[in-house]
Amino acid sequence: MIYNTFELHQEGSLPGAHLVTYIQEYSEAMAINDRPLILLCPGGGYTRTSDREAEPMALKFLAMGYHAAVLRYSCAPAEYPTSLKELAYSIKFLREHAKEWHIDPHKIVVEGCSAGGHLAASLGVFWDEDFLAESQGLSASEHELLRPDGLLLCYPVITSGEFAHRGSFENLLGSRQEELGEKLSLEKQVTNKVPKTFIWHTFADQSVPVENSLLFVSALRRAGVPTEFHMYEKGAHGLALANKLTETNDGRAVQEECLSLIHISEPTRH
């Protein structure tokens, strides 16, 4: 396995921001050559990146036949768009190394949990914005290098409206709530350019209400974006793998009914 850590140095990046890769090394003995990759954005309310939603999930995807990478993005006091630029850089970086690491450059899915889901969905919504391309030294014709091929959103923060997780937006926007709150309420920014999306959430989530996902799914449907949505009756917020591997100290994060890992794209034989 190619296990490496790459520091991130985008404008506004904080010390400690980095990308970790979990790349299955190429072997002539294996039928799969280029594998899809899951780029994970852990949650944490934009105050931190959760350990439970990082390496355990990356290793699970690796065992399923994917390459994986974990983005430890800058959180508060870093503000928007620092973490979005770090995510854009990461997907560009992975595509630039696709041939070397046998990544299928057309099957890079961005996964995000909770506030990390907001970050992942933000790239899904804003990948073709000129400011993002410019931040990566790309021309207007090179936006596609920043586009995820799919989104996998786990109990995501989406809306800044009635059902908002206020803490996430306070940490992300600081004093610019009024200026940027609507722009970062992602259900209001969906177009048909958003990649195909898989979302799951629990009805019982008391931290990030399921309405966040429902609003986003409704917007995706109106825009004609291929979407799959699973809502589970039981389960607290932050389930991660929903099994013993990512269990919290109080045991809340074990919910076997939640099949939280569903294949978006199977590794393809070449």
Task: List each language-model region with its residue ranges.
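Catalytic nucleophile-loop/oxyanion-hole region of alpha/beta-hydrolase
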Residues: T49-D51, L71-P105, E256
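Conserved alpha/beta-hydrolase "acid-adjacent" motif
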Residues: S207-L215
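Conserved small/polar residues in nucleotide/adenosyl-binding loops
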Residues: I262-T268
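Short beta-strand/loop motif that positions the catalytic acidic residue
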Residues: I199-H201, D205
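Primarily recognizes the serine-hydrolase "nucleophile elbow" in alpha/beta-hydrolase
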Residues: K92-G167, G181
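Short beta-strand element of the alpha/beta-hydrolase
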Residues: D34-G43
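N-terminal cap/lid segment of alpha/beta-hydrolase-fold proteins
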Residues: M1-I32
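Short amphipathic alpha-helix adjacent to the substrate-entry channel of hydrolases
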Residues: D51-A69
